[in-house]
């Protein structure tokens, strides 16, 4: 017949016998994590601002400066960004659905594969921006500047496409795409 294993005794009255072992293990894990943090093995904060994947849903980002930032896969769904500066920013794969970015600066920004349906881009500047594969149905580009922008494979409402074609010109400096051809202008 097998002998039962010894159960550790607790020094605390009424404590479960395994509680002391769990506390000791938690203490060791905490010490290890603190040691790694102090040694710099675990990065707590990046050296440069990195906002990739941040959720700005339903926030007011008016006049905020995001120029040159990595905002890939970030959500600005329902956000307001009047006169916000996104010049040179990487917004690849971001979500701007139902947002309002009137007079925003997107010069030279990467907006590839962005979901931007039902967005107000009135008066926004897309000079030299890459908008390949965007879904922009129901959006307004009234008065937007699209010189040197690349709209290859973009899904736009026919009304917006025609309006953008009236002002479109140039060649995108990054992709080499002709703006008028990328919009499917006649």
Can you describe what each PLM-predicted range is?
Residues 10-33:
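Bacterial N-terminal signal peptides that target proteins for export
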Residues 27-30, 34-186:
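Tandem repeat scaffolds
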């Amino acid at each position: 017949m097998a002998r039962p294993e010894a159960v550790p005794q607790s020094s605390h009255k009424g404590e479960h016998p395994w509680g002391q072992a769990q506390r000791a293990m938690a203490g060791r894990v905490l010490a290890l994590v603190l040691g790694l943090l102090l040694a710099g093995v675990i990065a707590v904060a990046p050296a440069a601002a990195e906002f990739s994947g941040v959720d700005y849903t339903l926030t007011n980002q008016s006049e905020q400066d995001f120029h040159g930032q990595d905002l890939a896969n970030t959500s600005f769904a329902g956000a307001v960004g009047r006169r916000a500066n996104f010049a040179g920013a990487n917004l690849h794969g971001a979500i701007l659905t139902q947002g309002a970015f009137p007079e925003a600066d997107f010069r030279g920004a990467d907006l590839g594969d962005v979901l931007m349906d039902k967005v107000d881009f009135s008066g926004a500047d897309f000079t030299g921006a890459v908008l390949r594969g965007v879904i922009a149905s129901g959006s307004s580009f009234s008065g937007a500047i699209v010189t040197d922008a690349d709209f290859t494979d973009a899904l736009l409402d026919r009304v917006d496409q025609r309006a953008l074609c009236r002002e479109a010109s140039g060649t995108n400096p990054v992709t080499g795409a002709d703006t008028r051809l990328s919009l499917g202008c006649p």
